[in-house]
Amino acid sequence: MQSLLLKIILVFICSCEVSQQFSHLAQAKETTRDVAFEANYDGSNQKYIELLPAGFDNKQRHDVLITLHGHGSDRWQFIKQPRGECVGARQVAARHKMILISPDYRAKTSWMGPAAEADLVQIIGALKTQYRVNKIILLGGSMGATGALTFTALHANLIDGVVALNGTADLVNYQNFRAAIAASFGGTPAEIPDEYKRRSAIYFPHKFTMPIACTTGAKDSVVPPQSVLKLLNQVRPFSKHVLSIHRPTGGHSTTSADTIQAIEFVLKGLQD
């Protein structure tokens, strides 16, 4: 009887050890959460994806990489898609043990209007409450790149570094996606000119005192590069760390290599 009891105890102990080992292995992997929250802006249900790095330890401080998707996409773009911009962002986040946050920000045609802006402010506040946040880098592609520049100009105190991949800095004169932008902003440029100017980074180069990296393509007809190239020249007196990756034969996309170079440049600049 005693022998049987001893065997049962040993089996229980072994099973607990195995369970703990599997638990440790699970924690060692990346963890993805689809997070829902009630927006302070209008009480609606909004979402973002949270990707915690392998071996995440909330006792340690972590940098945060916020990725803003392009027009017509949603919060899953930077988490799942094989585009160079998305792969590059995920690789850098994993390499540096960064918390990767990919918000809907009023998908699918956000353009960083008032609602999207308010959601992102709320998300950043929640992250700082939940985690030991070190630096926050805001990155976006296309519409998301435009949004990254807009948000940084509006809330420079919340962003430590910005990466814009094929975006525009001038929504006053940008001619594409007019209907979607008007819906996001609450009117056309003729109806609310001040709102378009307020959300155009080109008019606020002095706000960009943090490291900034932008990619552009000379043959990009979807989001022409001229306004971003102009912004970068205007930003140089205010920021010590400015990187322009301009591809003379490039279109409306950024390779994973260029994406990685841009993010790493900003991370290095933050170490100064």
Where are these regions (language model features)?
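Primarily recognizes the serine-hydrolase "nucleophile elbow" in alpha/beta-hydrolase
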Residues: A126-Q130, N134-A180
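C-terminal catalytic histidine-bearing segment of alpha/beta-hydrolase fold enzymes
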Residues: M112, V222, Q226-D272
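Mobile cap/lid helix-loop segments that gate and shape the active-site cleft of serine hydrolases
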Residues: Q77-G84, G167-F204, M210
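Alpha/beta-hydrolase active-site loop
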Residues: W111-Q130
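A domain-start/cap signature at the N-terminus of enzymes
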Residues: C16-H62, A182-A183, E191-D194, V242, ...
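Short substrate-entry loop that stabilizes the transition state in hydrolases
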Residues: D57-H62, L68-S110
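Short beta-strand/loop motif that positions the catalytic acidic residue
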Residues: F208, C214-T216, D220
